[in-house]
Amino acid sequence: MDLRSSAETDPDLSENHPGSVPAELQSRKQEQEKLSGVVKSVHRKLRRKYIEVGDFDKIWREHCEDEQTLSEYAMAMKNLADNHWANKCEGEGRIEWCRSVCQEYFQDGGMRRVLEKDEKSARHATAGNANTDTNAPPQLSSISTSSTFQLGKIRLLDVGSCFNPFLKFDEFLTVGIDIVPAVESVYKCDFLNLQLQQPLQLASDALDAFLRQLRGPIDALPAELFHVVVFSLLLSYFPSPYQRWLCCKKAHELLTLNGLLLIITPDSSHQGRHALMMRSWRVAVESLGFKRYKYVKFSHMHLIAFRKVSPTTSSDLVSRNYPEMLYIPQDFNTFDEDGFADCYEPPRSDFEDDQMACSFAELPETPYDSDSGESQSSSAPFYELEDPILLQS
């Protein structure tokens, strides 16, 4: 009789033979470490090449042509999600967070509340200007039928989707894209080189029909098409801050006005360790025409929601060095013959100390700095990233 296979279905037997289950768990742990190694090696290779060559366009083009490596990466990620992460998330997963933010914002009045807040602020600003400029034109109400969400499907673009986790939710009309999809429902697409077309002047149901007839590979999409764009564990994949910034800029162009950009990025450090980085990210993303809506720090990641508040972006973004503000700790890693060494962190100057002090306003304990008035933190374990996938430091 095979005690191990019986223990999987008979809890009493597993209690009588406690040694059988640890052997299985050990095997699962070894498999998880192997899959995690595949993922981390791809990221390490990309960063090494970027440090050596410096031409992120060339590096990315060669990376997208390496079909074998990309296929191994996609299958490793899907295997981790299906067989290792799913049983441990216990309701605090990144996908559930994205869904809850969308439900609160689009279906439970969140959008209307922030628009009313915007309108109130505009009235106060107008009243202040009226004291010095009696010829100032009256401000029109910002809350209109076109700026609030109408009942229907929430059009969601999941970039770097891999296995299309949002497809199971009825409230979303999901388009999942990836450079190498792990499942058939995800379309092949290189988001960095995606071409943007003029917005479609169609009713909402016609836009839904347009998305339903999409076929891969996707090389171009109309602007202002989606209510939500999701970057889940995406930005840290890229070795260059400029590539991360281009992704955020493209997301802004693809979103409708007041649409949401949801960014999830890994970080196993304690809550205040990278507060300066989160402040830097906020400034960079908001420079594109966003405003932060929510910010949550889980044990192993940052989860940030931005809403699109401006239909256009400034033409003077690169000169202000906004792209470089989307850095991650791994950008400062050095490498030797065996791979990456420990992350080097230079001593802070007095100016940086002042900036660090200011950055503590970014911590989730200060709810007033998100325009929803809500920020959260969680110390509960988030097992999905305990591998630690994507983390080098």
UniProtKB/Swiss-Prot annotation:
S-adenosyl-L-methionine binds at R94, G160, D178, D190, F191, S232. Its EC number is 2.1.1.-. It comes from the Eukaryota. The keyword Magnesium does not apply. It is an enzyme of class 2 (transferase). Transmembrane segments: none annotated. One of its GO terms (biological process) is methylation. Residues 125-136 have a biased composition (Low complexity). InterPro entries: Bmt2/SAMTOR, SAM-dependent_MTases_sf. Residues 1-35, 118-141, 362-393 are annotated as: Disordered. Keywords: Methyltransferase, S-adenosyl-L-methionine, Transferase. One of its GO terms (molecular function) is S-adenosyl-L-methionine binding. HAMAP family: BMT2. Interacts with the GATOR1 complex; interaction is disrupted when samtor binds S-adenosyl-L-methionine. Interacts with the KICSTOR complex; interaction is disrupted when bmt2/samtor binds S-adenosyl-L-methionine. S-adenosyl-L-methionine-binding protein that acts as an inhibitor of mTORC1 signaling via interaction with the GATOR1 and KICSTOR complexes. Acts as a sensor of S-adenosyl-L-methionine to signal methionine sufficiency to mTORC1: in presence of methionine, binds S-adenosyl-L-methionine, leading to disrupt interaction with the GATOR1 and KICSTOR complexes and promote mTORC1 signaling. Upon methionine starvation, S-adenosyl-L-methionine levels are reduced, thereby promoting the association with GATOR1 and KICSTOR, leading to inhibit mTORC1 signaling. PANTHER family: S-ADENOSYLMETHIONINE SENSOR UPSTREAM OF MTORC1, S-ADENOSYLMETHIONINE SENSOR UPSTREAM OF MTORC1-RELATED. Belongs to the BMT2/SAMTOR family. This is S-adenosylmethionine sensor upstream of mTORC1. The lineage of its organism: Eukaryota, Metazoa, Chordata, Craniata, Vertebrata. The gene is samtor.
